[in-house]
Amino acid sequence: MMFTGFPEATVQFFLDIRFHNNIAYFEENRARYERDVKAPFEAFIQELAPAMLSIDPQMELRPYRCMARLRRDVRFTKDKSPFRDHLWVLFRHAGEPREGSVMYWFELAPSGMNWGAGTWGENRQMMDILRRRIVADPDGVRNVIKQCHLTEHHMLVGGSSFKRLEVPAGVPDDLKGWYALRE
């Protein structure tokens, strides 16, 4: 199947499952899920496969490994809703655990879409390397950030930050936020 975009029916399914979040409703609408949600997401993964392979030839591209499951694990949560009202795709190096690995992601929800690159959870080793680079070569770090065109494309740098991390005196003000990032 060729990816032609996400149909309006994808978002409509997410809205419907939000308000009818039970197993009986899902089973009655499983065909809609397969057609309007799962098939477009799988086509999206296949469409992006060549680009992902050009970044890393060992990128995980099997749809069942890249696509989030609609069914939630509710064992340890107060919210026992069995289904998500959004889905995401993660592209990461095959065989790596999700936690701490570098990945590209895309999320579609009724409220909109998000996409980006980063890590899932903390990757202390990578962040320590970034901090050392900020101290040693702040202009080089600024140049890399500039080449990413973050501000021109309205992209945000997100993630949690250390609240009490001591930032060395030589770190420029515009890089202090980057230095304090946890992830």
Model regions and ranges:
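Soluble extramembrane domains of integral membrane proteins
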Residues: 55-57, 63, 69-93, 99, ...
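Aromatic- and glycine-enriched beta-alpha-beta binding-site module
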Residues: 75-137
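Aromatic/basic-lined ligand-recognition segments
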Residues: 70, 88, 163-176
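Active-site acidic/histidine clusters and adjacent loop/turn architecture
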Residues: 15-70
